[in-house]
């Protein structure tokens, strides 16, 4: 599913910065940049009908911590806007094409008190 998301993001002029970024405090499936925006993306796949579930509160917190770690380690400019997105990919049946839904601003992380966060 992440490979499909990477291809779709590239067509939309996003530049992939990291894939499966892991650190002790969490993980982010994809990190991409488009202009002055840094986007942290959770990718969900579902092989049957219905929406792929959005990440729960604990998983969102781990993604936010991993985003902060990424920004710190990569010395990301504090002038970049951060955004947390969800990409849902589904393949309802063998005969149907896969479906991709990109949900920008899937959750708000403005409560994060970190010098890197910019709402």
Model regions and ranges:
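Acidic-basic catalytic patches of nuclease active cores, encompassing PD-(D/E)XK
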Residues: 1-20
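Short beta-strand or tight-loop elements
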Residues: 12-13, 24-28, 80-82
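Hydrophobic residues on conserved beta-strands that form the core of alpha/beta folds
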Residues: 16-18, 40, 84, 100
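Active-site donor-binding loop signature of nucleotide-sugar glycosyltransferases
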Residues: 21, 43-45, 105
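Short strand-coil-strand connectors
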Residues: 22-24, 35, 94
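Conserved catalytic cores of phosphodiester-cleaving nucleases, focusing on short active-site segments
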Residues: 28-50, 63
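Mg2+/Mn2+-dependent nuclease catalytic core
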Residues: 46-69, 73
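Domain-level recognition of nuclease-like catalytic cores that cleave nucleotide substrates
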Residues: 75-119
């Amino acid at each position: 599913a992440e490979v499909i998301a990477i291809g779709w993001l590239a067509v939309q002029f996003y530049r992939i910065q990291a894939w499966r970024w892991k650190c002790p405090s969490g993980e982010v499936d994809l990190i991409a940049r488009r202009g002055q925006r840094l986007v942290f993306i959770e990718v969900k796949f579902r092989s049957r009908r219905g929406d792929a579930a959005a990440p729960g509160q604990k998983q969102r917190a781990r993604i936010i911590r991993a985003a902060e770690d990424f920004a710190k380690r990569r010395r990301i400019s504090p002038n970049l806007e951060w955004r947390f997105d969800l990409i849902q990919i589904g393949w309802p049946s063998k005969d149907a094409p896969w479906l991709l839904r990109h949900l920008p601003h899937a959750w708000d992380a403005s409560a994060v008190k970190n010098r890197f966060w910019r709402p």
